[in-house]
């Protein structure tokens, strides 16, 4: 076969970079393209309930496998996906957004086509996406199309940001040389400038050598930009106390003897706050300093000796080194840092949160107890997904087993995100290891935005655990403003009827209202095996919330009220 269609070329390239499931919806401008996915063995078209959920699913898949792809149709389809794409941009997640667009001739003639604004402007939606994309491409020439596809795939992966790729309907059936597939896409990072890199490393080593009370703080981009292994080795070699931010949950092993807890500024446990803020050197890996990630910007370091490791630059104290990538800096540091740190005398890390005290089995379930107890149910390798709201804050109180994947959307915070993200993560987990468990915690309010995607989970035989926290409405909003306001109320649903309503045949449902019911269920051997999809409704008091969320809500309300 000397030639293949451009559409097939796209899917072959995606398969080569380990993207095996593609998300999205069919539309008349992408139908011919979608035909080609079935020509590539090992590729799967998920077929979502709507484009927003598809974007969320692509985000969840990419967080596990490194990048993903969503395909939508021109105008109506692509715009429905943009909230999800914006979230991926904000949170550094590599999603390739492929849009089937009208033929080149139709665009040239400015035909008054459906799905347009009726003004002959076929570039308007492309322009809308540009500000939430690392780069964009609109294919117009079949001769350069393969190179453009390769560039878009590489950029998606390397930058961990969304990329927009427009494919006109008349080009996807045209042929390109098949031999192009024999040359893999270069997915490697370009080397750092040697002189700048040496200056950075020498400066860090000098700071490490002088430090008496250093700490390591792992944040979101530690996971997103693939330096988890380097960060773990950094902890092993130096024995510095290591902490995570809320967005960094899962980026380092929380069973490591040098793990000290979650740092969230003033919302941290007092001993964690003191340990981090009294440090004389902070090695901050992959920081994303958003309000909910920092306790409303309440970091209060006593030292100026802060080293920030970023994907595309380094910052040491007040000096910034553009273009110096943390991946290479960390790799080179690991060859010499043990010697620089040999004078360090390890200090004790903050004690782990003690186990819950024994209570009568009839005790009503509350969030503080539940999140602390959850660690007993989790297993090494689990994917734990926490929805914006009480779940995203409560999960900070749970100590993860090693090699746990943590997914939340602390920065973008689009409620309902995690239903779609769970679908994407479940596809990714199945491709890695069918026994890998995917566990969702979502509020009853958030679920109502994106519940349709449960039907896609059922369609594909995926087996996540769906924990629905039923506290009768939008609790996080109630805590911020309007505790009794009608706009924070929702219609109650019969959650345990949802799985059969969506057509599930092999499933389980449970309702848990007491500590005894929680322990009995989570300790059950068969329940711990991900043999079927499960929905577990957790009955909670209306205003019950993790204490750190209560405090964050006060800070957010104060910020909103400032003139």
UniProtKB/Swiss-Prot annotation:
Record PTM Omega-N-methylarginine, positions in chain: 161
Encoding gene (name): PDC1
Modified residues (N-acetylserine): 2
Subunit structure and binding partners: Homotetramer.
Similarity annotation: Belongs to the TPP enzyme family.
Cross-link Glycyl lysine isopeptide (Lys-Gly) (interchain with G-Cter in ubiquitin) residue location(s): 212, 233, 269, 332, 484, 505, 520
Other facts noted in the record for this chain: Present with 8966 molecules/cell in log phase SD medium.
PANTHER family assigned to the protein according to its UniProt record, in alphabetical order: PYRUVATE DECARBOXYLASE, PYRUVATE DECARBOXYLASE ISOZYME 1-RELATED
InterPro entries membership: DHS-like_NAD/FAD-binding_dom, PDC/IPDC-like, THDP-binding, Thiamin_PyroP_enz_cen_dom, Thiamin_PyroP_enz_TPP-bd_dom, TPP-bd_CS, TPP_enzyme_TPP-bd, TPP_PDC_IPDC
GO molecular function terms noted in the UniProt entry: branched-chain-2-oxoacid decarboxylase activity; indolepyruvate decarboxylase activity; magnesium ion binding; phenylpyruvate decarboxylase activity; pyruvate decarboxylase activity; thiamine pyrophosphate binding
Compartments reported by the entry: Cytoplasm; Nucleus
Biotechnology: Fusel oils and acyloins are important flavor and aroma compounds in yeast-fermented products contributing to the quality of beverages and food, e.g. fusel oils in whiskey, contrary to common believe, seem to alleviate hangover. In general they are desirable at low concentrations, whereas high concentrations may spoil the product. By adjusting growth conditions and substrate their production is sought to be influenced. Due to their broad substrate tolerance pyruvate decarboxylases are important biocatalysts for chemoenzymatic syntheses, both by fermentation and in vitro, e.g.
UniProt: pyruvate 1 binding residues: 28, 115, 477
Pathway in which the depicted protein is active: Fermentation; ethanol fermentation; Amino-acid degradation; Ehrlich pathway
Keywords, in A-Z order: Acetylation, Allosteric enzyme, Branched-chain amino acid catabolism, Cytoplasm, Decarboxylase, Isopeptide bond, Lyase, Magnesium, Metal-binding, Methylation, Nucleus, Phenylalanine catabolism, Phosphoprotein, Thiamine pyrophosphate, Tryptophan catabolism, Ubl conjugation
Catalysed transformations (reactions): pyruvate + H(+) = acetaldehyde + CO2; 3-methyl-2-oxobutanoate + H(+) = 2-methylpropanal + CO2; (S)-3-methyl-2-oxopentanoate + H(+) = 2-methylbutanal + CO2; indole-3-pyruvate + H(+) = indole-3-acetaldehyde + CO2
Taxonomic lineage: Eukaryota, Fungi, Dikarya, Ascomycota, Saccharomycotina
CC cofactor note: Binds 1 Mg(2+) per subunit.
GO cellular component assignments: cytoplasm; cytosol; nucleus
Binding site for pyruvate 2: 157, 224
Cofactor(s) needed by this chain: Mg(2+); thiamine diphosphate
This protein's name: Pyruvate decarboxylase isozyme 1
Activity control: Allosterically activated by its substrate, pyruvate.
Post-translational modification note: Cleavage of N-terminal methionine and N-terminal acetylation by NAT1/ARD1.
Residues annotated as binding Mg(2+): 444, 471, 473
Expression induction: Protein expression is strongly induced by high concentrations of fermentable carbon sources and under anaerobic growth conditions and is repressed by ethanol. Protein expression level is also autoregulated through an unknown mechanism.
């Amino acid at each position: 076969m000397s030639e293949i269609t451009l559409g097939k070329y796209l899917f072959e390239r995606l398969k080569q970079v380990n993207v095996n499931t593609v998300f999205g919806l069919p539309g008349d401008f992408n139908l011919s393209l979608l035909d080609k996915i079935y020509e590539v063995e090992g590729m799967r078209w998920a077929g979502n309930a709507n484009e927003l959920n598809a974007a969320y699913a692509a985000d969840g898949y990419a967080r596990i496998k490194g990048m993903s792809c969503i395909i939508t149709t021109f105008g109506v389809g692509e715009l429905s996906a943009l909230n999800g794409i914006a979230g991926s941009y904000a949170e550094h997640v590599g999603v390739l957004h492929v849009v089937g667009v009208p033929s080149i001739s139709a665009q040239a003639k400015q035909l008054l086509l459906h799905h347009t604004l009726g003004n002959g402007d076929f570039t308007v939606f492309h322009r809308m996406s540009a500000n939430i994309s690392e780069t964009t491409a609109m294919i117009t020439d079949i001769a350069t199309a393969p190179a453009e596809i390769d560039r878009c795939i590489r950029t998606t992966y390397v930058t961990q940001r969304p990329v927009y790729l427009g494919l006109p309907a008349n080009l996807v059936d045209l042929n390109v040389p098949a031999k192009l597939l024999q040359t893999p896409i270069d997915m490697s990072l370009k080397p750092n400038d040697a002189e700048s890199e040496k200056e950075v490393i020498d400066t860090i080593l000098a700071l490490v050598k002088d430090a008496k009370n250093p700490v390591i703080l792992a944040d979101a981009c530690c996971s997103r930009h693939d330096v988890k292994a380097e960060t773990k080795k950094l902890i092993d070699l130096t024995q510095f106390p290591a902490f995570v931010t809320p967005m960094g949950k899962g980026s380092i092993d929380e069973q490591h003897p040098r793990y000290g807890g979650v740092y969230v500024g003033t919302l941290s446990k007092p001993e964690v706050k003191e340990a981090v803020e009294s440090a004389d050197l902070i090695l901050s890996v992959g920081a994303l300093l958003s309000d909910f990630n920092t306790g409303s910007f309440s970091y209060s370091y006593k030292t100026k000796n802060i080293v920030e490791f970023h994907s595309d630059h380094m910052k040491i104290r007040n000096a910034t080194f553009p273009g110096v990538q943390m991946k290479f800096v960390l790799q080179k540091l690991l060859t010499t840092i043990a010697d620089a740190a040999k004078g360090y005398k390890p200090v004790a890390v903050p004690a782990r949160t003690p186990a819950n005290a024994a209570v009568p089995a009839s005790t009503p379930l509350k969030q503080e107890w539940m999140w602390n107890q959850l660690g007993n149910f989790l297993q090494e390798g689990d994917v734990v997904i926490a929805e914006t709201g009480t779940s995203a804050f409560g999960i900070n109180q749970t100590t993860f087993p090693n090699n746990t994947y943590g997914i939340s959307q602390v920065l973008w915070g689009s409620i309902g995100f995690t239903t779609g993200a769970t679908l994407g993560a479940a596809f990714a987990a199945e491709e890695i290891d069918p026994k890998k468990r995917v566990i969702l915690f979502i509020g009853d309010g958030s679920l109502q935005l994106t519940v349709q995607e449960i039907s896609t989970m059922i369609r594909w035989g995926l087996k996540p655990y769906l924990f629905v926290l039923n506290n009768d409405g939008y609790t996080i909003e109630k805590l911020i403003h309007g505790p009794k306001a009608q706009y924070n109320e929702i219609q109650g649903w019969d959650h345990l009827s949802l799985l059969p309503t969506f057509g599930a045949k092999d499933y389980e449902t449970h309702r848990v209202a007491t500590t005894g019911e929680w322990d009995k269920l989570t300790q059950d051997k068969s329940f711990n095996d991900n043999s079927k999809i499960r929905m577990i409704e957790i009955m909670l008091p209306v205003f019950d919330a993790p204490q750190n969320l209560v405090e964050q809500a006060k800070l957010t309300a104060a910020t909103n009220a400032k003139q």
